[in-house]
Each structure stands twice: as C-alpha cells, then as structure tokens.
Regions:
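Short, solvent-exposed S/T- and G/P-enriched segments that are highly enriched in secreted/extracellular
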Residues: 75-84, 110-128
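Noncatalytic modules at the cell exterior or secretory-pathway interfaces
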Residues: 125-140
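Repetitive, compositionally biased segments used for assembly/scaffolding
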Residues: 1-70
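Beta-rich globular "head" domains
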Residues: 68-108, 136-149
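Serine/threonine-rich low-complexity intrinsically disordered regions
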Residues: 7, 27, 57, 67, ...
Length: 149
C-alpha cells in the first residue's frame, strides 16, 4: 500500500474508484500508509470525494490522528486571539478546546468557519484547505492538529 500512497497516478485511480477508496479507508494498514505519505495527503486535500470517504470512516479518522505528518499548534496565554496557523494546503484534523466559560472559538479553512466548543474535549474537524488555516481561541493549552501538504 505504501507504493500506491506514494504514487500520485495510482492514488488518483484509487480516489476515483468508489470501491477501491472504501476498501482503503476501511483498512487500518492501508490508512496508516496513506496517512504517512505526503503525496497521499496532498492528493486527499484536493479531493472532496476522498475527504468525504475519510470523514465517514472511524478507521481513516484514527489513522489521520496518528499520522507522523500531524502538526500541533498550541495556544499560549488566556486571551481571545485570532491566529493564522498555516498558509498553503493541508487538512485540519481535530482540535482540543480547553475549558473556558464565555464562548466558543472557531477554525477557518479557506475562510469557511467551523465553530468548536471550548469544553475540554477533542473535536474532529476533517476540513481540507488550499490557501489558509486560522483559528480564533481563548484558553491556554487549546491545541489545533493539522497535516500540512
């Protein structure tokens, strides 16, 4: 599977075949290879079909959360702040919103806003972005996890 994950042509063929794509997102071994491949992550970030399949699969979501490519951005300080986390392509995987009374934050992927709860839990995002990833948050130790592509 690693050979397919690192070959853009082969990966595109898998993404364009619903049966093959469903087989991949259902397999922890296949998804581990995909989630470890920069080539695969870049292809997935540009495919709404692939993102939909991943979002519907607990196996695929867990593979992204365990990806060696995953980057964590942690909030420092207790104040409402908007930060641009990344310019360029990637996948916002999940966020930990540390508990705070007084409101929720948001994550923007290509200027599309998704609210997250500041309640001390991990919340899946699974949003691809092509140009930018930003976050509005308050509480120290809140952490946004994403895969740059």
């Amino acid at each position: 599977m690693a050979a397919v994950a690192n070959n853009k042509t082969a990966l595109t063929a898998v993404i364009n075949n619903a049966s093959a794509l469903n087989t991949v997102v259902s397999s922890s071994t296949a998804m581990a290879a995909v989630a470890s491949s920069q080539t695969a992550m870049a292809a997935i970030a540009t495919s709404s079909t692939a993102m939909s399949a991943i979002s519907a699969s607990t196996t695929a979501i867990n593979a992204l959360k365990a990806s060696p490519l995953l980057v964590a951005k942690t909030k420092s300080g207790n104040n409402w702040t908007t930060e641009t986390v990344r310019s360029g392509r990637g996948i916002a995987v999940y966020i930990y919103g540390a508990s705070v009374s007084g409101g929720n934050g948001w994550v923007k992927t290509d200027n599309v806003q998704t609210t997250f709860s500041s309640n001390g839990t991990n919340q899946n995002l699974l949003k691809a972005f092509q140009t930018s990833l930003s976050v509005y948050w308050y509480q120290n130790s809140s952490t946004l996890y994403y895969i740059p592509c």
